[in-house]
Curated annotation (Swiss-Prot):
Record gene name: yidC
UniProt family annotation: Belongs to the OXA1/ALB3/YidC family. Type 1 subfamily.
Keywords in alphabetical order: Cell inner membrane, Cell membrane, Chaperone, Membrane, Protein transport, Transmembrane, Transmembrane helix, Transport
Gene3D superfamilies per the UniProt record, alphabetical: 2.70.98.90
Main location group: membrane
PANTHER family the record matches: CYTOCHROME C OXIDASE ASSEMBLY PROTEIN COX18, MITOCHONDRIAL, OXA1
GO CC entries: plasma membrane
Membrane topology (UniProt): Multi-pass membrane protein
Name recorded for this polypeptide: Membrane protein insertase YidC
GO BP term (any one): protein transport
Subunit and partners: Interacts with the Sec translocase complex via SecD. Specifically interacts with transmembrane segments of nascent integral membrane proteins during membrane integration.
MF GO annotations: membrane insertase activity
InterPro entries: Membr_insert_YidC (IPR019998), Membr_insert_YidC_N (IPR028053), YidC/ALB3/OXA1/COX18 (IPR001708), YidC/Oxa/ALB_C (IPR028055), YidC_ALB_C (IPR047196), YidC_periplasmic_sf (IPR038221)
Pfam families: 60KD_IMP, YidC_periplas
Length: 560
């Protein structure tokens, strides 16, 4: 079979594989959230039974009792919720600035929920001891508080005294965003040494992941010994427990697409940390935790330990600010910018910068695209010249192929000599595409993973740049009263992208190889179906980029 025919078949098969592969792996409808449970707590160098009891269902507040438990109300411009005085558990947290969907009556996003509720998710900071004769605060301890409300302007002070006279103090502060600071002080008024270990845990019932999980990390995550550690829920489930011996723990937590809960331990110590899974009472439970080495408090002395909990939206500038202010290494990597991090984050900064002036991320995308196009103009011009020369050389290349058809080595040698003589780079025509690939994926990542793009409108029917175009030509863009299946959701922006791509192809020099030229003619149609499920912000970028390319090609054709 002719090699060109083989290449054509391979190209068509590859294109179809991309389309259906994308549909299978990335465009599945969002699954319903499952009602399952979160994790047990384990650690080395500690009485395992005591540590396990911290997060066992038996110690959880029952559903019917949850409303009766005394609580400290949380109130800030970003958060509302409460902290249970019983067990001092952060288990009720709502993100005031974010709605669950675009509907008018949509409730705000709930991050934390009490144990034994439908979407149980909570955090704890506390103390344990391997000395059985000493009673420390635990999940059943009811703390005394000097205030009923925690706000950025008013910290809350709590205390509890055991039968030996040992006093435990906790001061909780919250900033205007999503960071809690918990300072624990132990005053040893007894006549015995007190060995303690500080711990922190985040405990969560497993829920099904959002769509497109293959291009986005969701699950346990952290920075340990200045290295980013990411584990999928399946990884932890298979291993049951992933342990790290004493090490520098900057932060560990659980991340979703847009939300993060994270423990940030005191920097004065090293910690053992664990990512755990357990199946309890028919539900799956996941937990991340850290625990310090034993610290001994002598009689008459005291010890203070400061830890933090981040629980909120993964805003880029906010994570950057915390990383710098509190020296939290790699905190911005909680946002999955992907392999092209070095490009993706600057692209986001550029979009966010122009958003500050125009107030619309869609317009910001248009401005950034113009800048990228201007930066690449010289390269595009060189590419055009190279493609033009290649087309002019095609008759001579065909002559050489006929002359040395049976001598592949001589054939390649003669063709390379021709390129050298005519000063033609055969791959120069591909350079703009190769350069644009990381830019394309960077813009896609920015649109898909950054909270700033979530529910960000453009104009008209586009209410969310991070979601696909909601219209489709198969019901005449909403004029006909029926909803086509998902693979036929081909909206106005995908169609505009395909049309502008076709027009740009018509203005560009034709490829010298007729088989490749035929394949390229099908690309707008292939891309129409493949990209219809992409975030509409990406289609706006691609369409606008095609329009600029048409203008650029007109200029190059006229002056070259």
């Amino acid at each position: 079979m002719n090699n060109n025919i083989i290449n054509l078949i391979a190209a068509v098969v590859l294109s179809l594989s991309i389309i259906f592969g994308w549909q299978y792996f990335f465009v599945k409808p969002e699954q319903k959230k499952q009602q399952q449970r979160i994790a047990m707590h384990k650690s080395e160098n500690l009485n395992k039974q005591k540590l396990k009891a911290l997060a066992e269902p038996a110690s959880d507040i029952a559903v019917q009792e949850a409303s009766q438990v005394q609580r400290i109300k949380i109130e800030s411009e970003s958060l509302t919720g409460s902290i249970a005085l019983k067990g001092l558990r952060f288990d009720d947290l709502i993100l005031k600035k974010y709605k669950q969907d675009l509907s008018q009556n949509s409730p705000a996003v709930r991050l934390f929920s009490p144990a034994n509720t439908e979407n149980a998710y909570f955090a704890e900071i506390g103390l344990v001891s391997n000395l059985n004769s000493v009673k420390l605060p635990n999940s059943n301890t009811v703390w005394n508080s000097d205030s009923e409300v925690l706000s950025p302007e008013k910290p809350v002070n709590l205390f509890w005294i055991n039968e030996d006279g040992i006093k435990f103090l906790v001061t909780i502060t919250v900033d205007k965003n999503y960071l809690f600071t918990i300072e624990q002080t132990i005053i040893n008024n007894s006549d015995k040494e007190l060995p303690v270990q500080s711990y922190g845990l985040i405990n969560r019932k497993y829920i099904s992941l959002e769509k497109a999980v293959n291009i986005l990390h969701q699950g346990p995550i952290g920075c340990i010994d200045e290295n980013l550690k990411e584990y999928s829920y399946d990884d932890i489930k298979d291993k049951k427990s992933t342990k790290f011996a004493l090490s520098k723990v900057d932060w560990i937590g659980i991340t979703d697409k847009y939300w993060l809960s994270s423990l940030i331990p005191d920097k004065s110590s090293r910690y053992s940390s664990n990512f755990n899974y357990a199946l309890k009472q028919g539900t799956e439970r996941y937990q991340v935790d850290f625990i310090s080495p034993v610290q001994v408090i002598k009689p008459g002395e005291n010890l203070s330990i400061k830890s933090r909990i981040f629980a909120g939206a993964k805003k880029v500038d906010l994570l950057d600010e915390y990383e710098k202010s509190y020296d939290i290494k790699l905190f911005d990597r909680a946002i999955d910018f992907g392999w092209f991090y070095i490009i993706t984050k600057p692209v986001f900064y550029a979009m966010n910068f122009f958003y500050g002036y125009v107030g619309n991320f869609g317009i910001s995308i248009l401005i950034v695209t113009v800048i990228i196009k201007l930066l690449m103009f010289t390269l595009a011009n060189k590419s055009y010249r190279s493609m033009k020369k290649m087309k002019n050389l095609q008759p001579e290349i065909d002559r050489i192929k006929n002359l040395y058809n049976n001598d592949k080595a001589r054939l390649n040698q003669e063709i390379m000599a021709l390129y050298k003589k005519e000063k033609v780079n055969p791959v120069a025509g591909c350079l703009p595409i190769l350069v644009q690939i990381p830019v394309f994926f960077s813009i896609y990542k920015v649109l898909y993973v950054t909270i700033e793009m979530r529910q960000a409108p453009f104009f008209g029917w586009i209410k969310d740049l991070s979601s696909p175009d909601p219209t489709t030509i198969f019901n005449l863009f909403g004029l006909l009263p029926f909803a086509p299946p998902s693979f036929l959701m081909i909206g106005a922006w995908p169609i505009l992208m395909a049309i502008t791509m076709f027009l740009h192809q018509k203005m560009s020099p034709e490829l010298a190889d007729p088989i490749q030229a035929q394949v390229m003619k099908f690309m707008p149609l292939i891309f129409l179906f493949m990209f219809s499920s992409f975030p509409v912000g990406l289609l706006i970028y691609w369409s606008w980029n095609n329009i600029l390319s048409i203008i650029q090609q007109y200029y190059i054709n006229k002056f070259n």
